[in-house]
Regions:
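Short, small-residue-biased leader/transition segments that mark boundaries at the very start
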Residues: 1-4
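Conserved positions within compact, well-structured domain cores
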Residues: 8-211
Length: 211
């Protein structure tokens, strides 16, 4: 299944999207980001985490910092080159490129079936701390140990931690405006794919699948 060009023209900041030669080019206003695509079973996934700072209607996503932090407002966190989105941003339904969706529970469960629950075949070779669970990246999914944002116990804010140890992905529910019961968690010390607890303070990565 392939697309030469899809042209979406909202009133402001037109969005251009192309899917050709296993590359997704996501153009949102002046922001242009390309994502390699990998096919696993019958699914087409982005091979890198979403890293846009604009919604797919061209509007800016708020960067969450200690000076403007609010757990109820939509936004993203940034650490190094990594982008993490909070729950409020994810459930806007406006993060994924047109024609794609944030991976939902059905997509993740099908992926688990394809790989027989072996998280090692999803892990890229970069950043993971050494353990007996050795990444193989046999699928080309290229999951990276980006770390996650979680709640600070002492106050109402978020903190970045577990770099090199964990990566967690948002998992959508029945629609793109609701999350499933748990996210998807990969750890450095096990091949098992675990559930990631949610809260309004979490900042997790996003992977997309074609609709």
């Amino acid at each position: 299944r392939s697309f030469d060009l899809i042209h979406i023209s909202p009133p402001i900041n037109p969005v251009l999207l192309s899917f050709k030669k296993k590359i997704l080019s996501d153009v949102r206003g002046s922001e242009i980001i390309t994502y390699p695509i990998v096919k696993i079973g019958t699914q087409y996934w982005t091979r890198k985490n979403l890293r846009t700072t604009l919604y797919n209607d061209g509007k800016k996503i708020t960067l969450k910092t200690t000076s403007n932090y609010s757990k109820s407002s939509a936004g993203y966190f940034k650490e190094s080159t990594f982008i993490f989105y909070n729950k409020a941003a994810v459930i806007t339904g406006k993060l994924a490129p047109k024609g794609w969706k944030i991976a939902d529970n059905e997509a993740w469960q099908l992926l688990k079936t394809y790989i027989e629950g072996d998280g090692a075949v999803l892990k890229g070779n970069d950043l993971w701390e050494k353990s007996e669970s050795v990444p193989t990246n046999a699928t080309g999914f290229n999951a990276i140990a980006t770390g996650i944002f979680t709640k600070v116990k002492e106050n109402d804010s978020s903190i970045y931690q577990f770099a090199g140890k964990y990566t967690a992905y948002w998992n959508m529910g029945a629609t793109q405006k609701a999350v499933a019961e748990n996210g998807i968690l990969l750890r450095y010390d096990t091949h098992e794919i675990k559930g990631a607890a949610y809260s309004d303070y979490c900042g997790y990565s996003v992977r997309c699948v074609i609709e």
